[in-house]
Design a protein with these regions (language model features):
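Solvent-exposed alpha-helix faces
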Residues: 25-26, 196, 278
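Generic enzyme active-site microenvironment
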Residues: 115, 170, 208, 291, ...
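Active-site nucleotide/adenylate-binding loops and adjacent lid/helix of ATP-dependent enzymes
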Residues: 2, 6-10, 14, 82, ...
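ATP-binding N-terminal substructure of ATP-dependent carboxylate-amine bond-forming enzymes
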Residues: 1-120, 124-126, 130, 148-157, ...
Length: 348
């Protein structure tokens, strides 16, 4: 891999763009020879000086801003530029168009190599309801859920029905991640507040409500290799303090949560969770690497969702799990880049 081969693309227009900056900081440190391109919240793209990226502080809470005028007004313009020709893009994007298949389609149309899943699998994974249906079809246990549609009254009625059957709910965006926009519904008052706030965001943001399962929270990475083999990484366990949720602050700022890698669960549960994650990865048609969130209830592991471009920050689960199995981050990144090139070559 030469200095001219790789472009780390990060930032983006989604509400997960700050996590993307933190991922890019970590990836750029491990791949010092790569170029770094920043997509601003307005969609414009500009090469980012490495020193600027490295010096940016409080990435989870502060937007990165580059001085001057953007090099290209849009990602399409950047990908059409001569600077993109023949490059391999390492996608350090999270959420929105960076993870829902939009960016992937733009790269595919131009025959450019990129890491992670293709556009079709990305779109499937980003839609939680669609992903859950595909996982269930593959034999994975899921929980009852309902998409919240209509006005606040209709949403409240749907929440009340689900609440009556299950006693506690989780409400979250159908297309989103990093625990942004998460609501825990424990009673009528919570249901009313969630219905009002979700209705205020419709139709721009679609939400689903699903039954809450009491149990152990696990998350499991799955990694593809050049030899065609696929493996589950060691499970991570999330312990949440009473009264808190594994929301953005818990996930990235460490408030009220404890992460354990490897998870401290019985071997049979550990292996069942790994098998579930591999099944979900395959059911969605994913490539490269994913991370699947699971809750282990009284009846065993239950599928929640799959992240097709999981975080690679210093605090993220994939780096934790790679370290737990004894794999350094650089060889993992290099293999993902090699997989990206191999896919591009197959599709030519």
């Amino acid at each position: 891999m030469s200095a001219n081969d790789v472009i780390i693309l990060f930032g983006g227009t989604s509400d997960e763009r700050r996590v993307s900056v933190a991922s890019a900081q970590n990836v750029a440190t491990v791949l010092p020879e790569a170029e770094v391109w920043f997509q601003a919240p307005d969609g414009s793209v500009t090469p980012c000086p490495r020193a600027t990226l490295a010096a940016h502080q409080n990435a989870y809470t502060t937007d990165l801003q580059l001085p001057g005028t953007a090099r290209w007004p849009s990602l399409d313009a950047a990908l059409d530029a001569g600077e993109a020709r023949g490059k391999t893009f390492f996608l350090a994007l999270h959420g929105g168009q960076g993870e829902d298949g939009t960016t992937q389609r733009a790269l595919e149309r131009r025959g450019l190599a990129f890491t992670g899943s293709g556009s079709e699998a990305s779109a499937k994974g980003f839609d939680k309801e669609r992903a859950k249906a595909l996982a269930a079809k593959a034999g994975v246990r899921t929980v009852e859920s309902v998409e919240l549609t209509g006005d606040a009254g209709a949403m409240l009625s749907a929440l009340q029905g689900l609440l009556a059957r299950h006693g506690r709910l989780v409400v979250k965006p159908i297309r989103g991640g990093s625990s942004v926009g998460l609501y825990h519904v424990k009673g009528p008052e919570d249901a009313g507040r969630a219905a009002r706030e979700v209705a205020a965001q419709a139709p721009q943001v679609a939400f689903l409500a699903e039954a809450f399962v009491q149990g152990t929270e696990l998350t499991v990475g799955v990694v593809d290799s050049l030899d065609g083999k696929r493996r589950a990484l060691p499970c991570s366990e999330v312990r949440v303090d009473p009264g808190r949720a594994f929301d953005f602050e818990g996930k990235y700022l460490g408030k009220g949560t404890l992460e354990l890698t490897p998870a401290e669960v019985p071997p049979d549960v550990f292996q069942a969770a790994q098998a579930l994650a591999v099944t979900a990865h395959e059911a969605l048609g994913c490539e490269g690497y994913t991370r699947t969130d699971i809750i282990v209830g009284a009846r065993g592991p239950v599928y929640l969702e799959t992240n097709t471009l999981p975080g690679l920050t210093k605090a993220s689960f994939i780096p934790q799990q790679l370290a737990a199995e004894g794999t350094a981050l650089r060889p993992f990144l290099e293999e993902q880049l090699a997989l990206a090139r191999a896919r591009r070559d197959r599709q030519r």
